[in-house]
């Protein structure tokens, strides 16, 4: 992976609330022959079944969904603010219709195992898919975190 170094997930100092909710990210899946990416601003990170995990929600209608479904790995790439326009484009246009790499100028890169991410990212999470579930409105509990006591 270019100039990136592997770190323990617990060494990530940024707030997951800021990284995903405020800064946004690109979720990318596929291989060096064909991949797609889309902007995410929903998701989180934590511990599941004793392992560090990151998760996001992708509607089945999204082109990236096909890539996530057909591959065991995906990446979450986080960027500095100067890439906001690229993230806006990747969240509003479909890879079925445009070449997002050409339109944004972002540089695709690949892990040793061929998992796609973007070289301009400040942080990349390489994620192995361990669970997927279709959501329906009955399975969502709307408890916001507006009351936090410390």
Q: Which residue stretches match the model-derived regions?
A:
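Active-site-proximal mixed secondary-structure blocks
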Residues: 1-148
């Amino acid at each position: 992976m270019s100039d990136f170094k592997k770190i323990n997930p617990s060494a990530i100092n940024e707030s997951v609330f800021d990284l995903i909710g405020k800064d946004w990210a690109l979720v990318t899946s596929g291989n060096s022959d064909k991949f797609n990416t889309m902007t995410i601003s929903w998701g989180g990170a934590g511990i599941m079944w004793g392992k560090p995990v990151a998760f996001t929600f992708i509607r089945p209608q999204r082109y990236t969904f096909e890539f996530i479904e057909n591959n065991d790995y995906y990446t979450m790439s986080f960027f500095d603010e100067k890439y906001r326009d690229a993230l806006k484009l990747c969240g509003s246009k479909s890879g079925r219709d445009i070449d997002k790499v050409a339109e944004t100028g972002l540089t695709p890169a690949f892990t040793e195992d061929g998992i796609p991410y973007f070289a301009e990212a400040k942080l990349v999470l390489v994620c192995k898919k361990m669970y997927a579930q279709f959501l329906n409105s009955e399975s969502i509990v709307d408890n916001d975190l507006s009351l936090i006591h410390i």
